[in-house]
């Protein structure tokens, strides 16, 4: 049963999230619980993201973190590509539905590397330590860029840019960076707790599954309550596909020049989509969360193909 769940976690979690939303939206006797559930989810999602990052960073040593030239190039691609889309959203007049397409793509570009990317990288024959280093660096980049850009892209009349900047900074910066420093603190001053957390091999995986179900439910809610035409939702999903293809392509191309093609491809292409959906749903137009929501499918389809191809080559 456990093996079945691990194999089919992605569709099971997404299906559970979608069904969960429709149950709470349509079952009348659950109506009184809605305010509590909305509040719970608002706190639970960032907590699950924090816990995943903490468990991931507890498994690594600072001595394993090795900066590489390709790290700089990939960070530059992430920053420039997301800032270009932000500039288009700021200065190019466009209809609201097309803004959602660009917002969804922008989140897919600035979003940091997935915590599970090191596992896939190792299975594909890449350098897990180099990938983990980039995961930390991409978290730092997102923690800086997101609070600066999101309030400009999606301003609110009732709050100033500086107030919005501080609000997002206060939530995103600790969420992405504190897990690393907490892991270092536990390793140095509380070794028993650190060893316990590092020994929870599959816990981050299960936390990811729960978080994916929650953000899928939020994405479905955005789709159901949106007045946008179906073609707009398709365009947002296509934006996720284009950014997925582009990032895997450029990651692998740059990685080839430094003899680390697999690691660089996964570093730029495999995203922390739970975080991306949460950020777009919380700080941008909620409909834009369809972009990173579709990215979940695109990156997992590509990773499945890569793993299948590697197994096929090993058998030949």
Positions of predicted regions on the chain:
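Alpha-helical transmembrane segments of multi-pass small-molecule/ion transporters
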Residues: 1-316
């Amino acid at each position: 049963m456990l093996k079945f769940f691990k194999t089919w976690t992605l569709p099971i979690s997404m299906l559970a999230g979608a069904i969960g939303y429709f149950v709470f939206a349509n079952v009348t006797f659950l109506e009184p619980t809605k305010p509590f559930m909305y509040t719970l989810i608002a706190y639970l999602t960032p907590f699950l993201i924090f816990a995943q990052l903490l468990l991931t960073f507890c498994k690594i040593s600072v001595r394993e973190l090795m900066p590489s030239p390709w790290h700089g190039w990939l960070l530059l691609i992430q920053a420039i590509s997301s800032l270009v889309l932000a500039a288009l959203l700021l200065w190019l007049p466009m209809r609201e539905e097309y803004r959602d397409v660009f917002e969804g793509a922008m989140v897919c570009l600035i979003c940091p590397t997935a915590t599970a990317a090191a596992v896939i990288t190792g299975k594909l024959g890449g350098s897990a330590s180099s990938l983990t280093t980039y995961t930390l660096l991409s978290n730092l980049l997102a923690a800086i860029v997101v609070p600066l850009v999101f309030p400009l892209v999606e301003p609110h009349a009732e709050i100033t840019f500086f107030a919005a900047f501080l609000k997002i900074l206060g939530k995103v910066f600790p969420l992405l960076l504190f897990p690393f420093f907490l892991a270092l603190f536990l390793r140095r001053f509380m070794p028993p707790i650190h060893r316990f957390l590092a020994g929870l091999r599959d816990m981050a995986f299960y936390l990811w599954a729960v978080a994916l179900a929650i953000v899928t439910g939020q994405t479905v809610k955005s789709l159901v309550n949106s007045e946008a035409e179906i073609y707009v939702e398709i365009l947002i999903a296509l934006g996720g596909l284009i950014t997925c293809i582009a990032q895997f392509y450029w990651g692998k191309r740059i990685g080839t020049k430094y003899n680390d093609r697999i690691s660089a491809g996964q570093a730029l292409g495999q995203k922390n989509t739970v975080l991306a959906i949460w950020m777009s749903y919380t700080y941008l137009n909620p409909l834009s969360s369809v972009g990173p929501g579709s990215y979940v499918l695109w990156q997992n389809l590509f990773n499945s193909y890569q793993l299948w191809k590697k197994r096929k080559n090993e058998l030949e």
